[in-house]
Amino acid sequence: MKKKILPAAIIVGLIILILGIIGISSLIRKYTPTKETEDLNKYFNISSEDESALIVDNTVSDSKAKLIDGKIYVDYNFVHDSLNSRFYWDANENVLLYTTAADIVSAAADSSTYTVTKQANDFGYTIVKATSSSALIALDYVKQFSNITYKSYDKPSRIVITTSWGKIETASAAKSTQLRVKGGIKSPILKQVKKGESLTILEKGTKWDKAASKDGIVGYIKASTLSDIKTTELKNNDYTEEAFTHIKKDKDICLAWHQITNKSSNSKVANVISSTKGVNVMSPTWFYLNDNNGGLADLASKDYVNYCHSQGIEVWGLFSNLENKDVDAASVLTHTSTRTTLINQIMSAAFNYELDGVNIDFENITKEAYGDSYIEFIRELAIKCHNNGISLSVDVTVPASYNKFFNRADMANFADYVIIMGYDEHYNGSDAGSVASLPWVTTGLNDTLKEVPADQVILGMPLYTRIWELTPKDADNPVTDTADQSQYNITSSVYGMDAAAAQVSGNNATASPDEETGQNYAEWNANNKLYKVWLEDNTSLEKRLELVDKNKLAGAAFWKLGFENSSIWDIVIKYLD
């Protein structure tokens, strides 16, 4: 019996021993860091020997640098979007432009020469190479004009670029450790980190921190292996920020747009001005883009200018792209030659009529069509204006997701004033609503002030409104609740202040305060149609002027003369001196 028990015990013991060994092995595997290394060519997505990865501010870019004859070239779109948006590539005429505060710097494709205004300079090797879809620009040429630094590394080839400056958090490795693809000891190793090596901490975690090495490897490191954690100031001591100057007035701007549709209208300027108070800038709508070569239509009058000057009023001629629908503004602005012609035409008009300022009112611009070209147009025009003592103002819509390309901050570097077109919140073809509700205007102003200094902002205000006509799509349905405007055909007509008020009283309606819009509102029924109007009057105007005063803006602008009730000017002069 004992002989039978002994082998059984041995077998059980062996099973326990084997299970123990398996358990211990499993624990060892679980808690032993992997030594697997990540393929850095795969990590940086490098597929050919002439490519270099681009790491910008510790983020790996989808774009790649090209190594050509030992020189580093980067794609124009990468330069524009990630390094310096002031570079402009004219793909039509194969020229690279960069605009400083005082000069236009140009470089033709496949040339080593760049021109600063009219002075030629030799860069030493090809600056820009045209490609089928874009252009490749020498990185050292970009660096010459940009607040960036870069370093090159190999195995694999990569370029580490810094564009953001300021405070960063750094740490040192307390012992030899690793940067891994993800947080965890089983994640592949990106880099062996030596004791004392400095890293930038990008994100703090409980056990693992996201960090970047100086040679552009971004991964995760055990927080317990870091020491000497501190905040460091990152500076580029090799770059001096460019100084921009502006032609600004030592008084509040009170600008009135004066719509001129033919030359004979200019003779009415004395009567128009006599009905205003406090206006110190007239902006007549005299000029518009009239052909695809950059030519202008001209409705201006020297007598008009002389009269304004005799009254102590400046004249800022308005130049627009709206009147001639047959003109391809995109073509004009995307070709450097025709864009230059347009600028020269504007300056010629300014000289001929002794204009004090130029007001640019280009609208319906999309980024895809010519957004970047429009900003380049403003830069180049600003240099010409400033060289001749002429003020430049630019009319812009309120900031929105679809017009971020306007780059208002850079626009403000070059233009003297940015005029917010604080109207057309609702427009012909939209749902019924206010032309410029107070919350909408306030938001638009606040968003603009995030990019443009207050002393360069002029708030544009409407002197008109829209009366909305809502007709049921089903003629058998009575006008009831209009919350669902999809049930109605909606049209609108523009009315000046007095004409809109007359419509309200003429239809036996009563206007009452609408707290949501900050305006007086009226509605009435007629012939199974509902009419709505958010009035522009002294109430709405004063609330916007209060915004000008509160935010210490450069002034206000009004569209357009002839739409106003004469009583508004007493309110205007309370706020604009």
Region locations from a protein language model:
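Glycan-binding loop/region signatures in secreted carbohydrate-active enzymes
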Residues: 234-240, 465-544, 576
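Primary recognition of N-terminal secretory signal peptides and signal-anchoring hydrophobic helices
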Residues: 2-205, 235-249
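Acidic/aromatic/glycine-rich contiguous surface patches that form carbohydrate-binding/processing clefts
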Residues: 544-577
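Substrate-binding surface in catalytic domains of secreted glycosidases
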Residues: 292-299, 344, 367, 372-500
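Glycan-recognition patch characteristic of GH18 chitinases/ENGases
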Residues: 233-345
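Conserved, mostly hydrophobic/aromatic
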Residues: 282, 360, 418, 459, ...
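SH3/SH3-like beta-barrel fold
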Residues: 98, 196, 208-213, 221
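Short, acidic/polar
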Residues: 260-276, 336-351, 400-408, 536-549
